[in-house]
């Protein structure tokens, strides 16, 4: 099963798992929509699970002033992916956010390459999902 994790904000963290970590990137919001459109039309299968961080599920302390915008973007992505036939799971923000690159390497030691905070957050959302054995 392919799993795509999206950390939504002004920039979207993107992590993709297909038996191994295949991509870890950061996109602008509209770039992300185009990537998802290409992905959904090319793959068009129910064997891909999309994880989207739901901003309102976090603690009050973790919420930012941009919460409303992030929440709207997350809900728009959820509705859009669902309309395209994709499986979506809204997930609670986890405690493994804003890791430094060296800390991130302890969880994904095989990943080589630069990462942004957004990409690492998406990668950790994916890591936690896989660790919990949820499919």
PLM regions with names:
Residues 1-135:
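Phosphate- and other anionic-substrate recognition elements at nucleic-acid/protein interfaces
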């Amino acid at each position: 099963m392919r799993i795509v994790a999206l950390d939504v904000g002004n920039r979207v963290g993107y992590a993709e798992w297909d038996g191994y970590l295949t991509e870890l990137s950061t996109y602008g919001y509209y770039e992300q929509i185009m990537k998802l459109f290409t992905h959904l039309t090319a793959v068009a299968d129910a064997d891909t699970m999309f994880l989207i961080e739901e901003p309102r599920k976090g603690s009050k302390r973790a919420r930012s002033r941009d919460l409303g915008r992030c929440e709207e973007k997350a809900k728009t992505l959820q509705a859009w992916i669902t309309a395209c036939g994709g499986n979506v799971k809204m997930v609670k923000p986890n405690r493994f956010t804003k890791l430094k690159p060296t800390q991130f390497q302890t969880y994904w030691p095989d990943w080589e390459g630069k990462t942004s905070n957004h990409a690492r957050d998406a990668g950790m959302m994916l890591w936690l999902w896989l660790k919990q054995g949820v499919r």
